[in-house]
């Protein structure tokens, strides 16, 4: 893709977040967890489908790959919204360090997308210090927006601190929820691997 695949990761992430957000909204309106998740899945698919059709009227055109990533993100969102044991263990997040564009949803040059495995969700003993840690695996692309830079794609693995657990235990539940979707830059150690062109 013209963004090194970061735009596809962005589609997956955005549809995932939409599904999770609509699940919460529908539960707030009185639906049970399973019904709310199902309705959120269909809402996310409908909205991302409409957006993709809108792209068809623009110079971007309709992208089958975007649609696949929208479906995948919505399905992952549904799984995590309706299965507590999965949600305790996994997060999909975006790490964003503001840069040239004002829109973090299309500024792929300054974004990273990752899966976080939360060790406290693996039924560790309450006294184990490992419960405060997370394992990360992610992807990002650089240079695709700047003709003076070489295009680069990266995968990485890392170790992070479960900040949402810290905030939740400190009574900051709203902030803890936000950090299930957003990775604060500089809060993990990473081993980076550049993919061949």
Language model features: what each stretch is:
Residues 1-197:
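Hydrophobic alpha-helical membrane segments
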